[in-house]
Amino acid sequence: MGEEARALDMEEISDNTTRRNDVVHDLMVDLYPLSSYYFGSKEALRVKDEIISDRVIRLKSNYAAHGLRTCVEAVLLVELFKHPHVLLLQYRNSIFKLPGGRLRPGESDIEGLKRKLASKLSVNENVGVSGYEVGECIGMWWRPNFETLMYPFLPPNIKHPKECTKLFLVRLPVHQQFVVPKNFKLLAVPLCQLHENEKTYGPIMSQIPKLLSKFSFNMMEI
C-alpha cells in the first residue's frame, strides 16, 4: 500500500506540474516586431454611413430575424519600441475599429472571426488565412436595449439582450501579410495610448490594456 500511495502522489505531482506549465504558457504571449510583417492594400470596402436612428432600425430588423446579434473582434499584438501595440483599423481619420464583425446565423465564434480576418486583412476574403491562432475570449460587452450603450456586464433585469461583442486574443506568427481595403488604414497603437482613452478609442478598446494585464509579453527578436 505504501508503494502504491507514493506512486499515486508522484503521479498527482506530475499532473499538477503539467497543468501549471500549461497555464504559464497560455499567459505568455510572444510578440514579433512590426517590421516582420508585410502591409498592402486592396479594393475599397463599402461602409454603411448611417445615423443613430438608422442603426437602431437595422438592429431591430436583425433581432427580429435572427435574435441576439453577436460580434467577434480580434486583439492582434505586435512589438514596437519594446512595447506591445494593438493593430487597429482606422476609417476617415477618426473612427477606430478592431478587425472583426458580425457572426452569421449558426456560425461559431472562431469560424466567424477567421472569416472576418480574411475579409478585412487578406487579399482574398474567400480563402482562409493560415497563421492566426485564435485564443481565449478576454472580454464581453452587452447591449441591453437597441438604443443603449454597451456594458461589460449583463444587467440582472435584462433577460433578452440585443447584442453581444466578444474580444479574442489572436496570436500572430513571426511573419504575416496584412492586405487592407484602400479606405482603411491599419495602425499599430501602443497600449499606453489606448489606456482609458475612451474619447478617442471608445469604451471597449480603451479597456484592452486592463484586459491584457494578466498576460506576460515575450519580445521576440528576428
Swiss-Prot record:
Source domain of life: Eukaryota
GO terms assigned for molecular function: metal ion binding; mRNA binding
Site (Interaction with RNA): R55, Y201
Region described as Interaction with RNA: spans on this chain: 94-96
This protein's record includes keyword RNA-binding: yes
Species assigned in the record: Arabidopsis thaliana
Any one cellular-component term (Gene Ontology): mRNA cleavage factor complex
UniProt name for this protein: Pre-mRNA cleavage factor Im 25 kDa subunit 1
